[in-house]
Amino acid sequence: MPPAGQDDLDFLKYAMESYVADVNADIGKTTIVFTLREKAGALAETLKLFQAHDVNLSHIESRPSKTHEGCYEVLVEFAEAEDHRKIEGVIEHFQQKAEKKVLVQDWNTKNKQNKDSVPWFPQKINDIDQFANRILSYGAELDADHPGFKDMTYRERRKFFADIAFNFKHGDKIPTITYTDEEIATWRTVYNELTVMYPKNACQEFNYIFPLLQQNCGFGPDRIPQLQDVSDFLKDCTGYTIRPVAGLLSSRDFLAGLAFRVFHSTQYIRHHSAPKYTPEPDICHELLGHVPLFADVEFAQFSQEIGLASLGAPDDVIEKLATLYWFTIEFGICQQDGEKKAYGAGLLSSFGELQYALSDKPEVVDFDPAVCCVTKYPITEYQPKYFLAESFASAKNKLKSWAATINRPFQIRYNAYTQRVEILDKVAALQRLARDIRSDISTLEEALGKVNNLKMK
């Protein structure tokens, strides 16, 4: 029963945790999934909402929620013949009453996207469990032109790594891997050829951090570092963690991980027959290209800003953000002491392109997110154009200014204490933010006062 003094529909704000709505025009059905706290009468009172909007349900099912403790998820379906204005009324009421909004997912009518639609996005770090296994390619399956396609031993090994990733959940420890002599030999070839190039070609931040990885994570030619050791190191440095993944994720899912300072990393290594070539990201690319700079505070923040900008963004913006990621985190160069230096992982894990990118052969232009995000690029050959950043801090500020233009009907912020994304769409949320800002300003003022007192002594 509703609390005293509350009507049936207002009861939802006490009972409902979240909702997801999906209209599939191809099969002529509308689906809404909502999460209810386990309370007597919660489902019955919630279903009255559909009755109030004169919507006839064709299917109902429920199950215990895997992501909300003490709750259960309810799926309801109704036919395409239902008046979409009624459906929109239901969605609008959910938006008003759900305590933790999971906004409308792919809300479309006859393949036309509703102006108020917002794709589903994770709001807490363990929500990543819901999409981490939605890989697009590779994993245990290989294309016919892959160097390891005909090697059944290699393919079995890939399945072993894929199973680890598929069974991983947030909070788990990444299993320790005993790499084979053949795998270590492949790593050694890549490691030895790349590391001699870093002092001259990599950015200062990379060259500062790399020796720390050698000291703390066992980076060296004769041992492939363990992802859990690397994840622990990054956690101490910038709050980033590593999560094993079986293969390529969609741009939306991969960028969503960055929003929570989670980097999805493969554990498998390229085929031994082609140590200088890989058609996909492998552990050499992840550890030698990506990992070092995730330990740098400015770069870590820059990467997270791309992830945060992706949450709830429409598909066209995701494409632009993926392009920004490509030209920065994968193939970015920066200016240091009057020279071009590489900071992109695709460059720092590639023998030939690292030298090519810093030569006079390609076109180099200043980093401008508005231009960068719509620039076409090849995937299977060297880049004809690179974007030059003044610094990570400068690139981050430019990105934030550009991201502010994204048409998203709400603002978000990342709460590092709870590892949640907070939607700033209610007065209470804004008041909490204001209190946090006041507290930080107070801490800053006290620290400045103490520093000034020390100078005067």
Curated annotation (Swiss-Prot):
SUPFAM superfamilies: ACT-like, Aromatic aminoacid monoxygenases, catalytic and oligomerization domains. It holds the Pfam family Biopterin_H. Its main location: cytoplasm. Its EC number is 1.14.16.1, 1.14.16.4. It is found in: Cytoplasm. Disruption phenotype: Reduced L-phenylalanine hydroxylation. Lack of a yellow-orange pheomelanine-like pigment in the cuticle. Higher cuticle resistance to physical or chemical disintegration factors or oxidizing environments. Increase in superoxide dismutase activity. Increased life span. In a bli-3(e767) mutant background, growth arrest in early larval development, severe cuticle abnormalities with large blisters and increased superoxide dismutase activity. RNAi-mediated knockdown together with fah-1 RNAi partially rescues the impaired growth and fertility defects in the single fah-1 RNAi mutant. Expressed in the seam cells of the lateral hypodermis, in the ventral hypodermis and in the hyp7 hypodermal syncytium, in hypodermal cells in the tail and in body wall muscle cells (at protein level). GO terms for molecular function: iron ion binding; phenylalanine 4-monooxygenase activity; tryptophan 5-monooxygenase activity. Inhibited by tetrahydrobiopterin. Unlike its mammalian orthologs, pah-1 does not exhibit allosteric binding behavior for phenylalanine. CDD domains: ACT_AAAH, eu_PheOH. Keywords: Cytoplasm, Iron, Metal-binding, Monooxygenase, Oxidoreductase, Phenylalanine catabolism. Pathway: Amino-acid degradation; L-phenylalanine degradation; acetoacetate and fumarate from L-phenylalanine: step 1/6. It catalyses: (6R)-L-erythro-5,6,7,8-tetrahydrobiopterin + L-phenylalanine + O2 = (4aS,6R)-4a-hydroxy-L-erythro-5,6,7,8-tetrahydrobiopterin + L-tyrosine; (6R)-L-erythro-5,6,7,8-tetrahydrobiopterin + L-tryptophan + O2 = 5-hydroxy-L-tryptophan + (4aS,6R)-4a-hydroxy-L-erythro-5,6,7,8-tetrahydrobiopterin. Its cofactor is Fe(2+). Fe cation binds at H285, H290, E330. Residues 31-108 form the ACT domain. Signal peptide: none annotated. PROSITE patterns: ACT, BH4_AAA_HYDROXYL_1, BH4_AAA_HYDROXYL_2. One of its GO terms (biological process) is L-phenylalanine catabolic process. GO terms for cellular component: cytoplasm. Catalyzes the hydroxylation of L-phenylalanine to L-tyrosine. Catalyzes the hydroxylation of tryptophan to 5-hydroxy-L-tryptophan. Plays a role in the biosynthesis of a melanin-like cuticle pigment. Homotetramer. Belongs to the biopterin-dependent aromatic amino acid hydroxylase family. This is Phenylalanine-4-hydroxylase. It comes from Caenorhabditis elegans. The gene is pah-1.
